């Protein structure tokens, strides 16, 4: 293990506008609440909560979705965003490139006595990866990734023991740490759909790309995909085109997929290098980190990928 670090300076400009940060971290429940509040007043939005999709069919005229309660919905276009293990995607006949990392991710929130300086920190240790994501000066979201057969080493700890373990792993950088939430865990599987569209259908969010969390960029890709698809459909509708046609939906795929493929496979390659404990891999990653740290163009390219397309 090495205490050498790769750091990224604040970017100055993205897409022609001034910025002073790589990004912001926002709790998921706040995003969901804001999304709901932004559309709940629209009369043409109908929420079907607590109902799973049991059947999906498409034809030349429409898409049809059958819910668990037996209700049947029809539309010109079906947009699926039902997780990286999407049942809808499977029913549409879209295959995926899937990589099971054999690891378990655990997420929990902590409070601490020393500030995090609003800086995200990622630590690659042998056998586990730690990410510390600032939610406030003295509040940090912790993400622990560990081989699945060793997950109980973390899941079996009390809150007090877990806080002490984080302090040890961080060498007390945040001072005394206190776990203030439950520990949530899930298997780590990366997924990239081989197509983002099918007949009268499109995939967005994790149904299209489920990223490794090391870049904290998966949600951003989901937002980008939704924005690109909405723009493509709106422009086609304004021009009098059939926005549900394959020709139109393929425009979304052509605009979005090249970027997601680069990030998906590039991230997986980095993770493989950083978690390989063989001696050649250790030497290579040490050289890569040191080289990258001293090549501003490389840092700029990485920052650009994480802040804008």
Describe the residue ranges of each PLM region:
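Conserved N-terminal helical subregion
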Residues: 1-91, 99-104
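A general structural signal for well-ordered alpha-helical segments in protein cores
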Residues: 28-32, 36, 103, 107, ...
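Conserved FAD-binding catalytic core of PHBH/FMO-like flavoproteins
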Residues: 62-64, 72, 77-183
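C-terminal helical "tail/cap" subdomain of flavin- and related membrane-associated enzymes
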Residues: 231-309
């Amino acid at each position: 293990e090495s205490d050498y670090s790769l750091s990224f300076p604040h970017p100055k400009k993205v897409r022609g506008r001034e910025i002073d940060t790589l990004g912001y971290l926002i709790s998921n429940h706040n995003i969901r609440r804001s999304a709901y509040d932004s559309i709940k007043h629209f009369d043409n939005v109908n929420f079907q909560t607590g109902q799973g999709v049991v059947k999906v069919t498409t034809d030349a005229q429409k898409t049809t979705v059958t819910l668990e309660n037996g209700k049947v919905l029809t539309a010109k276009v079906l947009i699926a965003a039902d997780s990286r293990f999407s049942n809808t995607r499977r029913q549409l006949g879209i295959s995926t490139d899937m990589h099971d990392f054999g690891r378990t991710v655990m997420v929990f929130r902590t409070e601490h006595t020393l500030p995090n300086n609003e800086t995200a920190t990622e630590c690659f240790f042998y056998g586990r990866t730690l990410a510390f994501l600032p939610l406030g000066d003295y509040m940090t979201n912790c993400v622990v990734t560990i081989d699945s057969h060793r997950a109980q080493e973390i899941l079996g700890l009390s809150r007090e023991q877990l806080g002490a373990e984080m302090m040890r792993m961080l060498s007390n950088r945040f001072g005394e740490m206190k776990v203030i939430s439950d520990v949530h865990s899930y298997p780590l599987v990366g997924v990239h759909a081989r197509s983002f569209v099918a007949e009268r259908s499109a995939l967005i969010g994790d149904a299209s790309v489920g990223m490794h969390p090391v870049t904290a960029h998966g949600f951003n890709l989901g937002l980008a995909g939704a924005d690109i698809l909405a723009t493509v459909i709106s422009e086609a509708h304004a021009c009098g085109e059939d926005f549900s046609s394959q020709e139109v939906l393929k425009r979304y795929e052509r605009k979005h997929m090249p970027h997601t493929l680069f990030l998906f496979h590039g991230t997986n390659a980095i993770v493989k290098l950083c978690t390989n404990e063989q001696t050649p891999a250790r030497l290579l990653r040490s050289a890569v980190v040191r080289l990258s740290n001293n090549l501003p163009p490389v840092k700029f390219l990485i920052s650009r990928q994480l802040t804008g397309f």
